[in-house]
Amino acid sequence: MIQMQSMLGVADNSGARSVMCIKVLGGSHRRYAGIGDIIKVSIKEAIPRGKVKKGDVYNAVVVRTRKGVRRPDGSVIRFDNNAAVLLNNNQQPIGTRIFGPVTRELRNEKFMKIVSLAPEVL
């Protein structure tokens, strides 16, 4: 469950290390974002010579949350951290690699590129 001011890790090799959610997209007063939702983020920490720099604003898709996601069979998939993948204006990932596991729910959300790059899909 991600809301404004939430800090997230970055699960790709775009050069960002941590980002802060500045807006949850998809509704005028939408408060929370879960796995597969698009948020607006500001880069808070970045590595030198990366594709992005500190202070930049991007869209990102949430790929892991501590809150997790409930499956139709009643099981819940939870993670140890909150993580997002940065997107460009065409909703494609900026990085060329994805780190850590992602959930099968991203497949329904038109993020097949992220699912195919991920080392593990839960």
UniProtKB/Swiss-Prot annotation:
This is Large ribosomal subunit protein uL14. It comes from the Bacteria. Gene3D superfamilies: Ribosomal protein L14. Transmembrane segments: none annotated. InterPro entries: Ribosomal_uL14 (IPR000218), Ribosomal_uL14_bac-type (IPR005745), Ribosomal_uL14_CS (IPR019972), Ribosomal_uL14_sf (IPR036853). One of its GO terms (molecular function) is structural constituent of ribosome. GO terms for cellular component: cytosolic large ribosomal subunit. SUPFAM superfamilies: Ribosomal protein L14 (SSF50193). HAMAP family: Ribosomal_uL14. It holds the Pfam family Ribosomal_L14. The keyword Acetylation does not apply. PANTHER family: 50S/60S RIBOSOMAL PROTEIN L14/L23, LARGE RIBOSOMAL SUBUNIT PROTEIN UL14M. Belongs to the universal ribosomal protein uL14 family. CDD domains: Ribosomal_uL14. Keywords: Ribonucleoprotein, Ribosomal protein, RNA-binding, rRNA-binding. The keyword Zinc does not apply. GO terms for biological process: translation. Binds to 23S rRNA. Forms part of two intersubunit bridges in the 70S ribosome. Part of the 50S ribosomal subunit. Forms a cluster with proteins L3 and L19. In the 70S ribosome, L14 and L19 interact and together make contacts with the 16S rRNA in bridges B5 and B8.
